[in-house]
Amino acid sequence: MTATAAPETNPAFHLSGEALMGLRHLARRGVTPATRTLAGLPGGIVTKRRGRGSEPDDVRLWSEGDDRRHIDRNATARTGILHVRTHHDERDRAVVLLADFRPSMLFGTRRALRSVAAAEALALLGWRVVGDGGRVGLVVAGADEPTALRPAGGERAMTAVTGALASAHARALAQPAAADPPLDALLTLARSLLPSGGHLVLASALDSPGPDFDRLLTLLAESLSIRLILVSDAFERSRPPGFYPFALPDGRRGTVQSARQAAREPAPARLAADERLADYARRGIAGLRLDVEAGPEAYAPLMERLDAVL
């Protein structure tokens, strides 16, 4: 799948701000006030935060078992029926989404480009964050100057984020083929947009991240919460046997052979992705693998899990 072969309206290649805006309904599906108090704790189990929180959330009818201390006097006096006020945690979450649109991300063999999948996942996460009262910012890595938006809250912030993603992606597709610039400087830029204790979520295949990337990422993890969305194309995980032509940004061309793999043998690329995530997890940087072919419906529960630990 090549970026130049598709019409401008093909969603597999071209990001639409309207489509990313539409993901807000998918992102918020099934989210209730009870689930908005999930705590991000280490390990695979998500639990509720203790206590009732400090921020007013909603007023509802009294039900058996409710604490009488939470009775809302105004609503009760107005209706003559007992009402209670619910609360949620006061969390000022500032999250910067870092989208990798460098030339290596403009690749895909099923459903969409890796860059499109990265943007879809980040948009889903962004809608969840602002829906819970958090603030979302953006940094986009490409072959040209990066895009940066400071964290802000509400639908207006996500309108800016989705528009910036679509615009930056269109610029990336229009750029001539080039080598990937390193991601090191983009980490520094993202850090400058966040307060200490903020959250950075990076969506990338991490091809050619730069010689100083791992060291800098580990260093930043001491003051920020960092999460990785490792984007993976099906062809990388399981290549059918055969000969595959390739072309490099510097003009060199050639052919690579993919040998037949035993049916029970795990795909090396899949192992490499999982091992890479495990290595980052040992340094306190948790992450997940995002399969490009799965699509936003499958990404939504993944982003729900990721949101719970931010």
Please state what every model-predicted region is.
Residues 2-45, 61-66, 71, 75, ...:
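Exposed, interaction-prone extracellular/peripheral surfaces
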